[in-house]
Swiss-Prot record:
Keywords: Biomineralization, Magnetosome, Membrane, Transmembrane, Transmembrane helix. Essential for magnetosome formation. Can be used to induce magnetosome formation. Disulfide bonds: none annotated. Belongs to the LemA family. The lineage of its organism: Bacteria, Pseudomonadati, Pseudomonadota, Alphaproteobacteria, Rhodospirillales. This is Magnetosome protein MamQ 1. InterPro entries: LemA-like_dom_sf, MamQ_LemA. It is found in: Magnetosome membrane. The chain crosses the membrane at residues 47-67. It comes from the Bacteria. Residues 68-272 are lumenal.
Length: 272
């Protein structure tokens, strides 16, 4: 047994020191090849730049929206103002048309009344005072220039006013009317009326063209992409264009009204 134990103890076995050295070598190799995973931190510079760019982009976008919105408001107000100007001209045309017709009627009737009354009184005066001072002065003035010369000659008018009879009083009243209306001529009144009507129609056409041009610019701006979305969200709608009105909606001078505009004697001649 002792010999056996001695053989076992002395038998070749494992070298523990060598094993320890191998183990230490493995540990050293493991430590050498260990990958250290340390978190990387981004630099503050790139992050700050990205934040600045983002903020500036948002500010620029909002500023663009506000500027475009203000442009829509300006164009809308300009369109409404020009529409109002057009409607004002329409109302003015409607008001002045009736006034011009009435004014022409009054002038024509007044002129007709004056010359008709003068003619009647002249005839009565000539028949009643042939050879007298009234008849002689009246005939002389009529030969010099007719009724216009009679009314314009102050000396002859005063001579007639000094005579007896109703003709002198009537002529005095007539001269007072003529002095108040020195240019009572129906032809000129008609010309002025037609000129005024033409001017009003030209102004209305100009106002309509101005409005349609403004409406076209406004409609283009609110319908272009991508601003049509902004216009839809903010409630801007297309402006309607003015079209030419039908003839029935425009004031016209009918044949009946034209006959009323004529002096009475001319109207009677036309009817005949």
């Amino acid at each position: 047994m002792a010999l056996g134990d001695a053989n076992v103890g002395s038998a070749p076995g494992v070298d523990f020191s060598a094993l320890q050295r191998v183990k230490q070598s493995e540990e050293l190799l493991a430590q050498l090849y260990v990958v250290e995973e340390t978190p990387r931190r981004l630099g503050r510079g790139p992050v700050h730049a990205l934040m600045v760019i983002s903020v500036l982009s948002v500010v620029a976008f909002i500023a663009t929206l506000l500027m475009r919105y203000n442009t829509f408001v300006t164009m809308s107000e300009d369109t409404q103002a020009k529409r109002s100007n057009y409607e004002v001209m329409i109302q003015r045309r409607d008001n002045l048309f009736g006034n011009l017709v009435k004014l022409t009627l009054n002038h024509a009737a007044l002129e007709h009344s004056i010359f008709s009354h003068t003619s009647d009184k002249r005839t009565e005066g000539v028949e009643a005072g042939k050879g007298g001072p009234i008849g002689s002065a009246l005939e002389q003035l009529m030969k010099q220039g007719g009724i216009g010369k009679l009314l314009g000659d102050i000396g002859g008018g005063k001579a007639l006013l000094g005579a007896d009879g109703g003709f002198g009083n009537a002529l005095g009243r007539l001269m007072a009317v003529v002095e108040q209306y020195p240019t009572i001529q129906s032809v000129d009144t008609y010309k002025h009326m037609m000129t005024s009507l033409v001017e009003m129609e030209d102004r209305i056409a100009t106002r309509r063209e101005d409005y349609n041009a403004a409406a076209s610019t406004y409609n283009i701006e609110i319908t272009k992409w991508p601003w049509n979305y902004l216009a839809f969200i903010t409630g801007f709608k297309r402006a309607e264009y003015f079209q030419e009105k039908p003839a029935g909606d425009t004031p016209i001078i009918t044949p009946q009204l034209f006959q009323e505009l004529l002096p009475l004697n001319h109207a009677q001649d036309i009817k005949k």
